[in-house]
Swiss-Prot record:
Annotated positions of the Phosphoserine modification: S152, S194, S202, S253
GO MF, any single term: microtubule binding
PANTHER family per record: HVA22-LIKE PROTEINS, RECEPTOR EXPRESSION-ENHANCING PROTEIN 4
Protein name: Receptor expression-enhancing protein 4
Organism of this sequence: Bos taurus (Bovine)
Parts of the chain that traverse the membrane: 1-21, 42-62
Chain positions covered by the region annotation Disordered: 159-257
Keyword flag Transmembrane helix: yes
Keyword ATP-binding among record annotations: no
């Protein structure tokens, strides 16, 4: 564990940070010799990192594996050994120049295929999204149509006519029992008030009321005075008729006597 931590620290500092700063100095000073040197180093170091990914999985159990890796990185970087330049000139450059055309064709094919695959995946994704949207819309329309169909008149007619449910408190059941009023004309003993009535009126039946008379026009001031003046005459006539009737009734009584 300690050797692994030390190895990672050495690779980070001496394999990446210091060469990056040296490359910056070479670009700034426009020193072609240093520029070529650090370019060869970065090519070799990139291949080393690619190989390290697999060796850490399969050969990490080998004794002194991390120590050998640290020594190799220092050997590549050292200005005395110049291991990166030597590996590049003897192995990397000849192999790359030998398979350069094949590598270029593979890169071009990979670009074209990647472009085609991206387009195909994009089309498939759009088709899947469109189909999902259509299915969701059809489902929502079906649900809405079902709800509207449930509110049709045919379904409403099939609903049984019954009393509306009422809430009953279990603690006060006696107080909540509705007491029906007895019908009008019904006595406690089961007899009716009048024998002529064939039916008993209940509290739910409404007695028909006479139609309202049309509202008469208000009398004028002169008409009201005439009516007031005529009233005493009507009373005198009635009193005279009463006197005549009483006299006629008393006359036969005198004759009998």
């Amino acid at each position: 564990m300690v050797s692994w931590m030390i190895c990672r620290l050495v690779v980070l500092v001496f394999g990446m940070l210091y060469p990056a700063y040296a490359s910056y100095k070479a670009v700034k000073t426009k020193n072609i010799r240093e520029y070529v040197r650090w370019m060869m180093y970065w090519i070799v170091f990139a291949l080393f990192m690619a190989v390290e990914t697999f060796t850490d999985i399969f050969i990490s159990w080998f004794p002194f594996y991390y120590e050998i890796k640290m020594a190799f990185v220092l050997w590549l970087l050292s200005p005395y050994t110049r291991g990166a330049s030597m590996l590049y000139r003897k192995f990397v450059h000849p192999s790359l120049s030998r398979h350069e055309k094949e590598i270029d064709t593979y890169i071009v094919q990979a670009k074209e295929r990647s472009y085609e695959t991206v387009l195909s995946f994009g089309k498939r994704g759009l088709n899947i999204a469109a189909s999902a949207a259509v299915q969701a819309a059809t489902k929502s329309q079906g649900a809405l149509a079902g709800k509207l169909r449930s509110f049709s008149m045919q379904d409403l007619r099939t609903i049984p006519d019954g009393p509306a449910p009422t809430y009953q408190d279990p603690l006060y059941l006696e107080d909540q029992v509705p007491h029906r009023r007895p019908p009008i004309g019904y006595r406690a003993g089961g007899l009716r008030d009048s024998d002529t009535d064939n039916e008993c009126w209940s509290d739910t039946e409404v007695v028909p009321q006479p139609p309202a008379r049309p509202r008469e026009k208000p009398l004028g001031r002169s008409q009201s005075l005439r009516v007031i003046k005529r009233k005493p005459l009507a009373r005198e006539g009635t009193s005279r008729s009463l006197k005549v009737r009483t006299r006629k009734k008393t006359a036969p009584s005198d004759m009998d006597s």
